[in-house]
Swiss-Prot record:
Modified residues (Phosphoserine): S104
Organism per entry: Xanthomonas euvesicatoria pv. vesicatoria (strain 85-10)
EC number: 5.4.2.10
Cofactor, free-text remark: Binds 1 Mg(2+) ion per subunit.
Top-level taxon in the UniProt lineage: Bacteria
CDD domains xref list: GlmM
Biological role stated in the UniProt entry: Catalyzes the conversion of glucosamine-6-phosphate to glucosamine-1-phosphate.
Biological processes annotated in GO: carbohydrate metabolic process; peptidoglycan biosynthetic process; UDP-N-acetylglucosamine biosynthetic process
A cellular-component GO term for this protein: cytosol
Keywords for the protein's UniProt record, in alphabetical order: Isomerase, Magnesium, Metal-binding, Phosphoprotein
Cofactor (UniProt): Mg(2+)
Reaction(s) this enzyme catalyzes, per UniProt: alpha-D-glucosamine 1-phosphate = D-glucosamine 6-phosphate
Catalytic residue positions: S104
Protein name: Phosphoglucosamine mutase
Amino acid sequence: MSARKYFGTDGIRGRVGQGVISADFVLRLGNALGRVLTQGRSKRPLVLIGKDTRISGYMFEAALEAGLVAAGADVQLIGPMPTPAIAFLTSTLRADAGVVISASHNPHYDNGIKFFSAEGEKLDDATEAAIEAALDEPFHTVESERLGKAIRTRDAIGRYIEFCKASVARGFTLHGLKMVLDCAHGATYHIAPMLFRELGAEVVVIGAAPDGLNINAGVGSTHIDNLAAKVRECGAHLGIAFDGDGDRVLMADDQGNPVDGDDLLYVLARSWQASGRLTGTVVGTLMTNYGLEQALAALHIPFQRAKVGDRYVHQALVEGGGTLGGETSGHLLCLDRASTGDGIVSALQVLEALGRDGQSLREALASLSKVPQKTVNVRLDGGTAKAIVEAVNVQQALQQAQAAVQGRGRAFLRPSGTEPVVRVTVEADDAGLMQDTLDRLSGAVRDAA
């Protein structure tokens, strides 16, 4: 496959008003998608458009709508909704594609576009390539009688809440549980508190007053200390933090200890194994903590690593017949319940597992011992990151580092695909060994750079 011109690993993203994240480009993007979808069809395709709460979403929603309608596609405007909700609604409303306007955990001045197929899954490479090819063609407006129509959907919230509830057992309840929800002033701000209260929880809410500019600002899964402090302050049993578009979830236990995606993956894998729900291999990424790998091995649970990015975790799960995977950042995939990473659904799976096992979150994690891990970004003065990583002296230093932590951790290098940086990561069961190995390996990379 040739290199993508516009698409990254998770759609298109950047600074608003710069490069491709502009109204005129998004207008053409909508038109390109519409032309791809109308090819070979006798009836107008249907496209759903959702967004998070950042202020630029209004501009890009209008641009996408205009481009799609001009190409002859019908549009349903969903408004502010979690990214996974758009994936679900695209499938259940029999749409031909879904589009989300969001930059996930990024600040308000960034935005992006994500796409879903008719099945509610991320677009395949061939479809992305077709959209990119159409983008390089002239904007096209069909004859008046073939123009699409746009309507605003009113029942999307109720549909998605019922979908989330259906992901847990019918008798599942949260009565007696006090929780803190941090909605990152993002797309879950109205849905998550409503859902967890309907299930019986006592809910303390923070980060649920979006103004278009405060999304992810000191709140949400990228600022977990805020959640941890609130849990301690109000004596909650646990806390749950989402990111701006609701596809990530992190937690805090009753003492305010941060709980990341690796921790949650362990809770689910162990519980699902005991209940017979776990199938296939559990999938993490290159960044998944070595301690989790060891803990799963002790439980005889097969584990594999994919490249960083939830699309690669998803690909590995599908290829291996597994249903459970995720990233340290909180992208969790429960493919027997949702077609994509869903923060709310994943949180419900964890709460259901804790209830079934009769444990608090802290108790469920008592048997997991993660190892110290640290990543250093080495900025390059010249040359490409890939060339630096492949340099003979750097490869020799990497082999020495891997030998130093063999059986006790890992050492690896990741060239950035977007900036002149090599990411140096070392983890080991001893903090001193980890730091010494990291210093030596990052020093070798700096010398080569």
